[in-house]
């Protein structure tokens, strides 16, 4: 009986650790995507980056939308946040392209 409790405690601690690491992996993935987009010259990467961002945030958006009280606020905040992130990425890419032309 005691052995089973230890295994369950270990499983719970692993689940807590995974929940702690998920946001870090998300942030690292977005930073890598932004760096890849600013370094790349191909504009076709934009659609890949947008797709990766949508996949990354899809679970978070679903969690926000599942709460009825805050669904509209969360949706508006996620849209504004994604617009800001995308505009920063596009601006930095255009700035690098402009510097290469000069």
Swiss-Prot record:
A cellular component annotation (GO) from this entry: plasma membrane
Record's subcellular location: Cell membrane
Membrane topology note: Multi-pass membrane protein
Broad class of the protein's primary localization: membrane
Keywords: Cell membrane, Membrane, Transmembrane, Transmembrane helix
Membrane is among the record's keywords: yes
Transmembrane regions: 14-34, 35-55, 76-96
Protein name: Uncharacterized protein MJ0703.1
Native species: Methanocaldococcus jannaschii (strain ATCC 43067 / DSM 2661 / JAL-1 / JCM 10045 / NBRC 100440) (Methanococcus jannaschii)
Lineage: Archaea, Methanobacteriati, Methanobacteriota, Methanomada group, Methanococci
């Amino acid at each position: 009986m005691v052995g089973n409790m230890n295994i369950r405690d270990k499983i719970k601690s692993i689940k807590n650790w995974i929940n702690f690491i998920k946001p870090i992996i998300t942030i690292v993935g977005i930073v890598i995507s932004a760096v890849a987009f600013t370094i790349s010259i191909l504009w076709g990467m934009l659609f890949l980056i947008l797709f990766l961002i949508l996949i990354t945030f899809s679970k978070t958006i679903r969690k926000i939308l599942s709460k009825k009280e805050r669904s509209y606020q969360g949706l508006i905040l996620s849209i504004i946040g994604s617009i800001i992130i995308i505009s920063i990425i596009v601006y930095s890419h255009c700035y690098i392209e402009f510097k290469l032309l000069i």
